[in-house]
């Protein structure tokens, strides 16, 4: 769920793309963010985050990751942006 910014609302697709590309599901407009930076993927009741080849990396709870499970309350850092993952917030 996005709670602040231009993309506010629940994200209901199985793959959510975050990046500087204007057509990203979560548009993060800053030079520290790659055009195609990261994806949040839902598989059943589980969620994962994966970096998709970004220059500056994707961080989960302050650790750089390539692919990792997401849990409620986890903090993602993409470039200068910090995002907190909340599951099931319609």
Regions found by a protein language model. Give the residues of each.
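Hydrophobic aliphatic residue packing
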Residues: 26, 33, 49, 65, ...
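Short hydrophobic/aromatic patches on the structural cores and recognition surfaces of FHA
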Residues: 18, 36-60, 73, 83
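A short, sequence-level motif marking secondary-structure junctions
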Residues: 13-17, 30-34, 70, 89-90
